[in-house]
Amino acid sequence: MIKEVVKRDGTVVPFEKNKITMAIYKAMLSVKNGTMKDAEQLADKVVARLKDKERPSVEEIQDVVEDVLMTSKIDGKTFTDVAKSYILYREKRRAIREEKELMGVKDDLKLTLNAVKVLEARYLLKDEDGKIIETPRQMFRRVASHIGIVEALYDYIKYKKTGKVPENAEIIGKVSPTQEEVLRRAFGYMKEDGIIEGTFEEFMDFIQTKGTSAGHYINRFEEVMSSLDFVPNSPTLMNAGTKLGQLSACFVLPVGDSIEDIFETLKNTALIHKSGGGTGFSFSRLRPKDDIVGSTKGVASGPVSFMKIFDVTTDVIKQGGKRRGANMGILNYNHPDIMEFILSKDSENKVLSNFNISVGVTDDFFDKLDNDDYVDLVNPRTKKIMKRIKAREIWDAIIDQAWKTADPGLIFLDEINRKNPVKNVGDIESTNPCGEQPLLPYESCNLGSINLSKYVVDGKKIDFDRLRETVWTATRFLDDVIDANKFPVEQIKKVTRMTRKIGLGVMGFADMLIKLEIPYNSWEALEIGEKVMSFINDESHKASQALAEERGVFPAWYGSEWEKEGIKMRNSTTTTIAPTGTISIIAGCSSSIEPIFALAFVRHVLNGQELLEVNPLFEEKTRELGIYSEELMRQVAETGNLENVKINEEVKKIFVTAHEIDPQWHVLMQATFQRYCDSGVSKTINMRSDATREDIARAYRMAKDLHCKGITVYRDKSKTVQVLTAGTAETKKPEEKEVIELVTKMPDKYLKIDSTFDPACPTGKCDK
């Protein structure tokens, strides 16, 4: 009788007959032959054939399954077609395993092939000869061990105050050299902050004699990552457990109006990019082009010329060869060089390839635009008006360039600062490269995202209890990252630890909707987004409040908006919606809150490599419906969508893709998540190649009216090289009638999102 099974990697696991049954049933569904009862009977035959083996291998079991399918007959039915489907699937899995082995990766988490390719190129540790020396699970263990060990410091602080050790404490005999380095550095941070007593040697004696809960949290952190329920940002995955030790994804650096300040910032940028971080800047302090330079009596070259220097530096660094550097460049709308800035990424100029650019706009700009008024272009050095220009002229230039090149986007500065919980520290003038994280000068933030596709149970409901557990674990993890971090610049350490911002976000939202059988472009989808994100935001706040009771409030809490409301928080912000481009590949889910880009598409990653992807949920659905075929997959791959494919209309609605969705639905979804997000939302408003400038203007204005903090559009094929390509053929644009109907149907709750009721404003009493 079978008791255990030997897996391909040699590990032994308990035998589960149901796995055989489901494998057979899935093959039956793909050819529309057989029932669950048939599958159960065939599985019984497989088990009977193996009755003399107590511990067969996976390969042995699969060989018997093939033979049973080829030779069995039930009620006159034969299953040779099912056997063929099973054999083809088995062969496909074998080819994938072989390709993973050729990459030198031992995949102990059964990740997708694309995930393994990304891990092999960027994340898994290698020796001096370039040979991979860890598995994906070991990578997550490395990260968990680096982050979780700082729990020991808080156990020590508590012990010094109360004389108690945690109930789950375990004595640590010896920590690794890397863990000791993390502890020594974090101990120093806490000593500077005045929250820890004694010497480092006394602390080490404590964990080796009294014990710590660090082991418990290390295991929990590893579990939540290895299950792909939660994945932290790329620098944490790449640098945790290494000498580099820099764990944050996003930074904002100030750019002062002097050569000394500019090149000090450039040096800091290089250090950040070397460690895998991205940087955001406002160049609005720089004197305009042709302004006088006091020291030489010459003329200034202006912000755009200095941006080019930052761009070239980024290109040279290439973040240690692991990923391309990224920058956000912002210039306020009333800077004298605003028109040059807006045109700086025109295809004719071909500069700033390592920059996203956005115009910083305020409520005053939109007032002038609505009243057809003039904007005063003010020299930031002298504060004098250099020129007056119609707001409409600036707006038209922004829209025209966004249509041509997808840049610039908009950053709504007043909206950001209305929701700034630490006004006592300063105003926010910039964001990280993708726009989701508004930050103070010298501030950094570490991000991580929950894979929502993992929380749909029974095909119809969301497991909020398990989601709550993950939110609390992830919030604790991200707070620990701040202490485990090795900051590239002293000032960044100071500001980051002062505000302790963290950014918990989501990915796999489109997958969640598909599993729930809800179209992305529907009011029901907006309601799900609202329900899920409000839950995550509330629970992350509760988790941060619990950490504040346990560890203390963030230092800048005193005088903050949180203190005014009497709410003790460990972190000034807790939620951010990041784009999750790479970590969603690792997790095997859809990106961020984006719809599916295509059901079949080519993804350009890793310096020119291409990954061909077919959506696994679509493949699963077609097999379930018994309509899967290679011919159908090839047909879908022509455009990446189902618009011209003869298939069930309900399936078409559920598997709607980004370019089939009217831009207004994209903006509505961004606004819905923004209402329940402390920081910002990175979302691309995808448009078809034949979208008009009016479409872009409508989306930009809608984002402002719905209290988004920024907006980026992308008209298909508006860049010469784009990250995602869907199929090879064009699809027709929805009729204008659909757009008109959409606007007519829009309920007040989404048209009139008042900032005083926005949960992204922590107190609910933000100034208008």
From Swiss-Prot:
Disulfide pairings: 250-445
CDD domains, per database record: RNR_II_dimer
Gene3D superfamilies in the record: 3.20.70.20
Record carries keyword Plastid: no
InterPro entries, sorted: ATP-cone_dom (IPR005144), RdRp_reductase_class-2 (IPR050862), RNR_lg_C (IPR000788), RNR_lsu_N (IPR013509), RNR_NrdJ/NrdZ (IPR013344), RNR_R1-su_N (IPR008926)
Reaction equation(s) it catalyzes: a 2'-deoxyribonucleoside 5'-diphosphate + [thioredoxin]-disulfide + H2O = a ribonucleoside 5'-diphosphate + [thioredoxin]-dithiol
Keywords, ordered alphabetically: ATP-binding, Cobalamin, Cobalt, Deoxyribonucleotide synthesis, Disulfide bond, DNA synthesis, Nucleotide-binding, Oxidoreductase
Cofactor binding comment, as recorded: 5'-deoxyadenosylcobalamine (coenzyme B12).
Biological processes annotated in GO: deoxyribonucleotide biosynthetic process; DNA biosynthetic process
Active-site residues, as the UniProt record annotates them: 432, 434, 436
EC number(s) from the headed UniProt entry: 1.17.4.1
Gene Ontology MF term list: ATP binding; cobalamin binding; ribonucleoside-diphosphate reductase activity, thioredoxin disulfide as acceptor
Domain ATP-cone: 3-97
Keyword Lyase on entry: no
Binding site for substrate: 234, 249-250, 278, 432-436, 579-583
Required cofactor(s): adenosylcob(III)alamin
PANTHER family assigned to the protein according to its UniProt record, in alphabetical order: RIBONUCLEOSIDE-DIPHOSPHATE REDUCTASE (PTHR43371:SF1), VITAMIN B12-DEPENDENT RIBONUCLEOTIDE REDUCTASE (PTHR43371)
Protein function: Provides the precursors necessary for DNA synthesis. Catalyzes the biosynthesis of deoxyribonucleotides from the corresponding ribonucleotides.
Family that this chain belongs to: Belongs to the ribonucleoside diphosphate reductase class-2 family.
Summary of subunit composition and partner proteins: Monomer.
Protein's name according to its UniProt entry: Vitamin B12-dependent ribonucleoside-diphosphate reductase
Organism name: Thermoplasma acidophilum (strain ATCC 25905 / DSM 1728 / JCM 9062 / NBRC 15155 / AMRC-C165)
